[in-house]
Design a protein with these regions (language model features):
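N-terminal subdomain of lithium-sensitive/metallo-dependent phosphomonoesterases centered on the IMPase/IPPase/PAP
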Residues: 1-89, 174
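Glycine-centered loop/turn positions within well-structured domains
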Residues: 20, 66, 102, 125-126, ...
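Residue-level signal for inorganic ion chemistry
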Residues: 22, 48, 59, 92, ...
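Flexible, active-site-adjacent loop/turn segments at secondary-structure boundaries
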Residues: 28-30, 42, 93-94, 100, ...
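Short, well-ordered turn and helix-capping elements at secondary-structure junctions
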Residues: 72-74, 89-92, 163, 183
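Conserved protein kinase catalytic core
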Residues: 77, 93-96, 127
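Glycine-rich active-site/cofactor-binding loop and its immediate structural neighborhood
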Residues: 82-122
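Acidic beta-strand-loop-alpha-helix segment within the catalytic core
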Residues: 107-191
């Protein structure tokens, strides 16, 4: 289902709203709490919670019939068939250590099918949007279409991912390692 320009612009407004909350907190002394019952250490900060609250407030005002699923505050039902999925600070460990490997994730579903994905890196001024079968990097007001590199074989591939040792079982790590041995280059990082 094609997504119209109004929804694309609104998703960008949600990212702007999130970034306005998060940017002043990056590389500042902020409290870090632990979300109980998730992982050994699953940090959450006021940046995570404040940004999600700000996004939810904007959604309630302008799209009150849409459902919401957020990392920090869970699910809110809707009646429009649209559902916004939010993780305002994906990579909280990187965020609290002052590294740039984090971003705000905003996705939109229509009747259970994904129709838009947005990654905003507000301190770097980079925004990635995937919608209507295309992906773009928006930076300094300019849009650049993104495409995957041509890759005829696994030995030409570059594998970039979160460090599998952070979340995977030993069996899953071994599977990733088998793939990694066959690629041209591997880069792990972030959380």
């Amino acid at each position: 289902m094609p997504v119209d320009d109004t929804l694309i612009a609104f998703a960008s407004r949600l990212a702007d709203t999130s970034g306005a909350v998060i940017r002043p907190l990056f590389r500042q002394r902020i409290d870090v709490a632990h979300k109980q019952g998730r992982h050994d250490f699953d940090p959450v900060t006021e940046a995570d919670k404040g940004a999600e609250r700000a996004i939810r407030d904007l959604l309630r005002r302008e799209r009150p019939d849409d459902a919401i699923l957020g990392e920090e505050y869970g699910a809110q039902a809707g009646t429009s068939g649209y559902r916004w999925i939010l993780d305002p600070v994906d990579g909280t460990r990187a965020f609290i250590t002052g590294r740039h490997e984090w971003g705000s994730l905003i996705a939109l579903e229509k009747d259970g099918a994904p129709v838009l994905g947005l990654l905003d890196q507000p301190v770097l001024g980079e925004r990635f949007i995937g919608v209507n079968g295309a992906a773009h990097l928006i930076q300094a007001g300019r849009s650049q279409k993104l495409e995957v590199r041509a890759c005829a074989s696994l030995s030409e591939a570059v594998l970039c991912a979160t460090d599998p040792r952070a979340y995977f079982t030993n069996e899953q790590v071994a599977a990733v390692d088998r793939v990694a041995r066959g690629v041209k280059m591997t880069r792990y990082g972030g959380d």
